[in-house]
Amino acid sequence: MNNHDKIYDMFDRNSGAKPLICVEMSGNHQGSLDVAVEFARSAKSAGADLLKVQVYKPDTITFQSDFPDFKLSGDNDWADYGTLYQLYEKAHTPWDWVATIFTEAKKLDLPVFASPFDQTAIDFLEGLDCPIYKIASPEITDVGLIEACARTGKPIIMSTGLASSKDLDDA
């Protein structure tokens, strides 16, 4: 059984089976590769079955702009960043870190998969042999992204939290 088959078998759950636990790293690395690696170790020691990372660059998912559509406002923690670009710049995981996280997680026998946000991220993740792709809920209408993930021949998890019935039909 190859490594991908082992991972895919994790999703084959019967009633009464223990839950599949996936830990999301997202921006929880606090801007430190050491924290990111320790996060993976902690996830494994806490019993996680899988680790998920987000792979994007601020320049590929938004514009550096002060126009209202790109500003973060309101009474929430994100508003402190000012713009979407500034938020994504702070929260993104540098791609060389992603490669290190994949390597370190493999040593821990902790499978890693990812949410890519564009073709460049998919190309990068294919180089890491990412076994599964997850489409984030806000990207559920990005048919090009979904098709690009599908072309890899790997399973896709689609988050539907923000999706309407029409969005699901289109996806």
Task: Please give the residue ranges for each predicted region.
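Conserved, mostly hydrophobic/aromatic
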Residues: E24, A43, L125, S159
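Glycine-rich, proline-tolerant flexible connector loops at the mouths of alpha/beta enzymes
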Residues: D49-H92
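Conserved anion-binding
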Residues: T141-A171
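N-terminal amphipathic alpha-helix/helix-capping segment at the start of soluble metabolic enzymes
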Residues: M1-V23
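Active-site beta->alpha loop and helix N-cap motifs at the rims of alpha/beta catalytic domains
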Residues: N76-V143, S165
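Catalytic domains of carbohydrate-active enzymes, especially glycoside hydrolases
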Residues: E38-K57, L128-D129
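Hydrophobic faces of well-ordered beta-strands that scaffold small-molecule active sites
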Residues: I21-V23, L51-V53, V112-S115, P131-I135, ...
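Glycine-enriched alpha-helix->loop->beta-strand junction motifs that scaffold or abut catalytic
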Residues: G47, F124-Y133, A150-I156
